[in-house]
From Swiss-Prot:
Matching Pfam families: REV
Lineage, uppermost ranks: Viruses, Riboviria, Pararnavirae, Artverviricota, Revtraviricetes
Organism superkingdom: Viruses
Cell location: Host nucleus, Host nucleolus; Host cytoplasm
Gene: rev
Name under which the protein is recorded: Protein Rev
GO MF entries: DNA-binding transcription factor activity; RNA binding
Species: Human immunodeficiency virus type 1 group M subtype H (isolate VI991) (HIV-1)
Family membership: Belongs to the HIV-1 REV protein family.
InterPro entries: REV_protein
Annotated stretches, region: Homomultimerization: 18-26
Assembly notes: Homomultimer; when bound to the RRE. Multimeric assembly is essential for activity and may involve XPO1. Binds to human KPNB1, XPO1, TNPO1, RANBP5 and IPO7. Interacts with the viral Integrase. Interacts with human KHDRBS1. Interacts with human NAP1; this interaction decreases Rev multimerization and stimulates its activity. Interacts with human DEAD-box helicases DDX3 and DDX24; these interactions may serve for viral RNA export to the cytoplasm and packaging, respectively.
Amino acid sequence: MAGRSGDNDEGLLRACRIIRLLYQSNPYPEPAGTRQAQRNRRRRWRARQRQIHSIGERVLATCLGGPAEPVPLQLPPLERLTLDCSEDCGTSGEKGVGSPQTSGESPAVLGTGAKE
């Protein structure tokens, strides 16, 4: 693989083999039995698939040396966030009603949190 060292290639190939083996160990359930039994088998299969997916992510992160902690999402300060419904107010079925907007000033929209 271009631009990578041979050692890293071996780790990546080993990780791919492990992940492939994990997915092959959980075949789709057979369509036999009652509808309820089929539904239960599919539900359990999906739960196992989710577990395999998370294990596969961990295997890749371990073999490729990814970051241990995810990079946190940078959010604006809460003081600058306001809920302004003046532009879009309408019936509750419309989309976009009350979308959050940021402004330069920090009005006391929610108050201090103390009950009156």
